[in-house]
């Protein structure tokens, strides 16, 4: 099975081979133009509208009716008071992953109350709460296994990026020892949120 993660701007490019893709993950933090521009979610000055996104998803489903649609939302200082659940319900998505913005460098992330305000507001507005998965800051640290273009495992922490030696030079087992990776936290990322209060 293969999956693709995209910001949605060129989603139509997936359609010709959508029949061979099991899941498409789309990064959507807001449907407000101003919010998307502030956080840099734009392409050549243009943001993706809800209607445009709905049309592109419908076209992909025409090619592959069984394809799973996942939305990834990073809660940040510009969108934490927005409600996306009502519009996402119209898209009939299969999974909605809500992530808390991680501190990185000079960016301190968001306060816990901002993250939980977003969760609470969208939980009660959601028509499919069983499709919601959440990741707070602690859950995100060291729980992703990422590879850079030059073949290095890497992680991020408050100070920036940490890299292993390239996989072309060392065995996978040795490279993993050079970064922080928590396999149990990785598994916990896929737990289903059954209740939020």
What are these regions (language model features)?
Residues 48, 55, 110-117, 148:
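Generic recognition of short, well-ordered alpha-helical interface segments
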Residues 1-98:
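Radical SAM/AdoMet-radical enzyme domain recognition
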Residues 83-91, 98-101, 112-118, 122-123:
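Anionic-ligand binding region
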Residues 37, 95-115, 138-141, 145:
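Flexible glycine/acidic-rich beta-alpha junction loops that bind and position SAM and/or redox cofactors
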């Amino acid at each position: 099975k293969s999956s693709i993660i995209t910001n949605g701007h060129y989603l139509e490019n997936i359609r010709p081979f959508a029949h061979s893709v099991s899941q498409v993950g789309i990064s959507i933090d807001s449907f407000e133009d101003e919010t998307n521009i502030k956080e840099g979610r734009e392409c050549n000055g243009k943001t993706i509208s809800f209607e445009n996104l709905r049309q592109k998803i419908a076209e992909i489903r025409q090619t592959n009716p069984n394809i799973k649609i996942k939305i990834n939302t990073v809660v940040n200082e510009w969108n934490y008071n927005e409600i996306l659940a009502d519009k996402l319900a119209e898209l009939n998505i299969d999974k909605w992953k809500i992530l808390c913005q991680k501190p990185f460098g000079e960016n301190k992330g968001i306060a816990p109350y901002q993250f939980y305000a977003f969760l609470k507001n969208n939980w009660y507005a959601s028509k499919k709460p069983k499709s919601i998965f959440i990741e707070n800051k602690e859950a995100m640290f060291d729980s992703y296994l990422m590879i850079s273009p030059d073949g290095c495992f890497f992680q991020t922490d408050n100070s920036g990026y940490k890299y292993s030696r390239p996989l072309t030079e060392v065995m996978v087992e040795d490279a993993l020892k050079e970064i922080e990776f928590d396999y149990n936290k990785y598994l916990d990322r896929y737990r289903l949120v059954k209740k939020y209060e």
